[in-house]
Amino acid sequence: MNELRFDGRSVIVTGAGRGFGRAHAMTLASRGAKIVVADYGVDVDGAGSSPEPAQLVAKEIEAAGGVAVPCFASVTDEEGANSMVRTALDAFGRLDVVVNNAGICDPHLFEDMTVERFRRMVDFHYLGTVLVTRAAWPHLLAAPHGRVVNTASEAILGNVPKSTAYSAAKGAVFSFTRALALDARRCDIRVNAVAPRGITRMSEPPMLARVFDQPEEAFVNPFYESLQPEGVSPAVVYLAHESCTLNGEVLICGGGRALRLAAIESKGITREKLTPEDIAENLEQVMDTTDPQVCGLDMPEP
């Protein structure tokens, strides 16, 4: 198969100053994309800011022979989102792809989660995804093959402790991806997401030890060390490419694996007049996922 190239394409990558975003930006640039390295340089919990991460990655890309411009802007407000789009148009004259990657990590038990912390998590992960996509949308409509790649998480399955805010925000990204894909079916825009498996500053041993209440040593082993950020980028590259036919899908990717993340439904039970007792008496059948069906993924034509 020919290499998936992005020659002449303009791509915004948010949170591109570190971790997954940096890996995506570097990989896309190596395949010919012109990159807006968008990053507000916040701490892992969303506090502070610095232009340095975006500047350094843009220089890295240029040093490797690619084309990139930094953009010091936040995804959490409209002006920041608009600034990213303006940067792409001013520098490259077009916008073809948005990779919504920016995010933070601030694990707390629910009873310790303040409203301010909850809102900050939603602002970075969900609202940031919405604002940047909304600012870019008219230009993606005008592009030959507009693409949006969001960042979801397996945490939406409820398998990560101390993550009520994070998991809820990522769940919103999952639903937003599905809903926007339905709207986008009328044009040649594809909206999908990745659920990364990899180690960044948000998932290094000290952070994992805090989340799972285990010693750091439990997360220092060859398996975790194999989960480099670059291992997620193949899914991002495919979903961002004009040849991608998927729409409204989420791909788990990392550590050499790529697989589909989808909601399923069991066959369940059917009664003409369903009662609570019917559910109680047939709970095993209701919950049986031996022969599941992927739900909510039919994309009807407009």
Task: Say what each PLM segment does.
Residues 214-302:
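C-terminal helical subdomain
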Residues 111, 158-164, 186:
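Active-site loop immediately N-terminal to the catalytic Tyr-X3-Lys motif
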Residues 153:
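Residue(s) in the substrate-gating loop at a strand-loop-helix junction
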Residues 3-37:
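Canonical Rossmann dinucleotide-binding motif of NAD(H)/NADP(H)-dependent dehydrogenases/reductases
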Residues 133, 169:
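Active-site helix of classical SDR
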Residues 51-55, 71-86, 115:
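The beta1-alpha1 cofactor-binding region of Rossmann-like NAD(H)/NADP(H)-dependent oxidoreductases
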Residues 61, 109-110, 114-119:
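Substrate-binding pocket helix/loop in short-chain dehydrogenase/reductase
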